């Protein structure tokens, strides 16, 4: 007897990056369901800029999306998305998103997705895991929006579980979990915007510079450095300030981490 069919999209995307001809190339992109990518861009010659696409435009209960990327030694890839990920109200089923990013020695990943918006009544579970080597380099952010504060809508009900992990040489540097349920937002000071930014490897000098850049967020932002992993966390009720500060921090860190000047992805300018 066949197992019952699952409701919702069951989608996977597996990306493999290699070095060829002095630049990073997308060697393969295997996908099932509505997850795909645009043709890579090369605004910096050897660095690969890639946009993830989810044509349905939103994620609902019962959807299961799995994204994985593997960067071979020496690769440098910047991955972003053309728009926010929207998690819509669920009648009970859970939406599940798994993201696993694996970096070989000397590989560099800039993981810069747009924000994820959780509508009231959404039921979502997200797992994002970065597997690094000691000589890998990572710049990544994770920006969550609870409800639609621009129109006065709050995350008054629903469930969100967001797990973020960073491993270096098979040792955990960061294992962080946020769980919100039924409008109880006291753990995030009732703020609708929750952000995390990660940089590896980092130094005390970078930590000081990042703290200066966080000033517009006031008391609801902080940065720490543990085992060369710089972690920025912040809360806010203003999306424009959030996005500006995250980009400012990225623009400050990028030259130090990669030796390259900041080059904004084209899609951010449209």
Curated annotation (Swiss-Prot):
HAMAP family given in the database record: UreD
Compartments where found: Cytoplasm
Record key words, sorted: Chaperone, Cytoplasm, Nickel insertion
Species per Swiss-Prot/TrEMBL record: Klebsiella aerogenes
GO molecular function annotation: nickel cation binding
Functional description taken from the UniProt entry: Necessary for the functional incorporation of the urease nickel metallocenter.
Cited Pfam families: UreD (PF01774)
Protein name in the entry: Urease accessory protein UreD
Keyword Protein transport: no
Domain of life: Bacteria
Organism ancestry: Bacteria, Pseudomonadati, Pseudomonadota, Gammaproteobacteria, Enterobacterales
